[in-house]
A protein has these predicted regions:
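Conserved small-residue packing positions in alpha-helical repeats and bundles
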Residues: 91, 120-123
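N-terminal J-domain/J-like co-chaperone modules of DnaJ/Hsp40 proteins
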Residues: 1-48, 72-75
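Alpha-helical repeat scaffolds
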Residues: 101-107, 131-142, 168-172
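Conserved small/polar residues in nucleotide/adenosyl-binding loops
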Residues: 254-260
Length: 260
């Protein structure tokens, strides 16, 4: 996933809740190394699980720029590691040693914000979308966790609205993974509806476009209409089959397009 691979927190070698001074210290270290032609690495590069990072002065500056605004800090933090408890310290020691399964086992021992968040990231790294969604539904379904998440990342001074954090998380997943891969694992009804809309709309739009093209043959004779009908059937077959996977056959939206 691009948002993991190129996460600005990862490039700067920090946790999402690391102090700003630590971020700046790592940035300055990078600049010093790069100036003499040396590469620099950090434990949070986790090269055992993600592709190696090609750091440049420009990419380091870009990473800092991406973390300027609180909303961007939160967005990228939704897809990176956080460390707030002694249990996290133990788990990260295993993670850095290449023992991601042991790290996950430790985080599974206690439900808390950092454990859930880190389990989400580990699951996404391993393409374990079922586990990622399961943990995310618990985390994003708990307002206390969300408020704690925001205050841990950006402090308590701001007035950050946490109500849309879940949908922001889902939107990124849909863009990077695809709605169809996520839907089977989702149990939250509002999440299903949100992802369903993102998955269905492009299919409906493509069907409607094909219908509009077919309707342009109206009045051009029976052969033209017959050919248009055959073309419509071919061009919409895959989209309609995909719609069947998202919608029940008695759904108004589906039956309307299927009938057309």
């Amino acid at each position: 996933m691009n948002i993991l691979q190129n996460n600005p927190y990862r490039l700067l070698g920090v946790y999402s809740n690391s102090p700003t001074k630590e971020r700046l210290a790592n940035h300055n270290r990078m600049k010093a190394f790069l100036k003499v032609g040396k590469s620099v690495s950090f434990p949070l590069d986790v090269p055992q699980y993600l592709s190696s990072i090609n750091r440049t002065e420009a990419s380091a500056a870009d990473a800092e720029a991406k973390l300027t605004l609180p909303k961007d800090q939160i967005l990228h933090a939704q897809f990176w590691f956080i460390k707030t408890t002694p249990l996290d310290e133990v788990a990260f020691n295993h993670l850095f040693a290449g023992e991601i399964e042991k790290a996950e086992e430790i985080w599974q021992k206690r439900e808390c914000l950092s454990a859930l968040q880190n389990r989400i990231v580990c699951a996404l790294i391993r393409n374990g979308y079922d586990s990622a969604i399961m943990c995310a539904e618990v985390l994003y379904g708990n307002t206390q966790y969300l408020n704690q998440f925001v205050s841990t990342i950006i402090g308590t001074g701001g007035n950050f609205d946490v109500s849309n954090l879940a949908f922001s998380f889902l939107d990124i997943l849909c863009d990077e993974i695809g709605a169809s891969k996520l839907l089977p694992f989702i149990t939250n009804s509002s999440w299903k509806e949100h992802i369903g809309e993102k998955a269905v709309k492009p299919l409906v739009d493509s069907i409607q476009e094909a219908i509009n093209i077919a309707q342009k043959t109206k009045g051009k004779g029976s052969n033209a209409r017959l050919n248009a009908g055959e073309t419509l059937r071919r061009n919409t077959r895959n989209a309609i089959l995909q719609l069947k996977g998202f919608l029940s056959t008695n759904c108004l939206l589906y039956t309307s397009d299927a009938a057309d």
